[in-house]
């Protein structure tokens, strides 16, 4: 058995499907939505529309993972400038604030983990007091289609606009896609005049290593 990123995530996807935590239809909808949202992202690598018929006809990489369910391996770079409170107001009258960051890791041994949930995400919800926050936008570092409905349910984002950039399914810059998610959340708060945004970054097999960031516009 391969332990590559795609292969190991097949294990998680099979478990989530078997336990009825996610569905095939949710994954297909994720791919279609990502391609539609790619129109909002000038840096997206994949912008062609995907219909239900196209998705169903796509070849399997490793059942039940199709090509459309996987991210394009992308080259690029990201940078972020974080300023102190007094310095931020030298650049803008309306800075976006980092209200909280939670960053933790789970075991690299897949056999010792419960792949139907995520303790690091659950800890972030508690540590950042996210349960009672109504988020306006979310950007998740979800490299495979099954991760989107999984994380949206864990983070209570089912009705929150998510990955309006298309997310990693339309452009997945190696070692930068998580930082991109934070930057895209910032951009949404600036351009849409929204109040609360949540960003997520991850690395390791099956969402092993997770960072959750709460961004806020102060009124």
Question: PLM ranges: what are they?
Answer:
Residues 18-23:
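Basic phosphate/pyrophosphate-binding loop/patch that engages nucleotide-derived ligands
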């Amino acid at each position: 058995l391969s332990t590559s990123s795609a292969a190991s995530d097949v294990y998680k996807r099979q478990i989530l499907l078997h336990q009825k935590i996610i569905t095939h239809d949710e994954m297909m909808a994720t791919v279609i939505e990502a391609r539609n949202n790619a129109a909002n992202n000038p840096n997206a690598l994949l912008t062609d529309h995907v219909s239900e018929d196209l998705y169903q006809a796509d070849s399997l990489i490793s059942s039940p993972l199709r090509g459309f369910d996987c991210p394009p391996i992308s080259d690029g770079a990201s940078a972020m400038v974080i300023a102190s409170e007094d310095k931020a107001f030298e650049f803008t009258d309306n800075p976006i604030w980092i209200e909280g960051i939670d960053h933790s890791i789970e075991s690299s041994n897949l056999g010792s983990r419960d792949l139907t949930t995520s303790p690091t995400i659950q800890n972030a919800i508690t540590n950042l007091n996210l349960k009672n926050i109504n988020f306006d936008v979310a950007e998740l570092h979800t490299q495979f289609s099954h991760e989107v409905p999984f994380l949206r349910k864990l983070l209570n984002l089912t009705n929150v606009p998510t990955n309006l950039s298309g997310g990693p399914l339309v452009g997945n810059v190696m070692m930068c896609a998580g930082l991109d998610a934070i930057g895209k959340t910032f951009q949404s708060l600036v351009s849409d005049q929204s109040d609360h945004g949540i960003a997520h970054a991850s690395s390791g097999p099956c969402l092993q290593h997770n960072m959750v960031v709460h961004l806020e516009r102060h009124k």
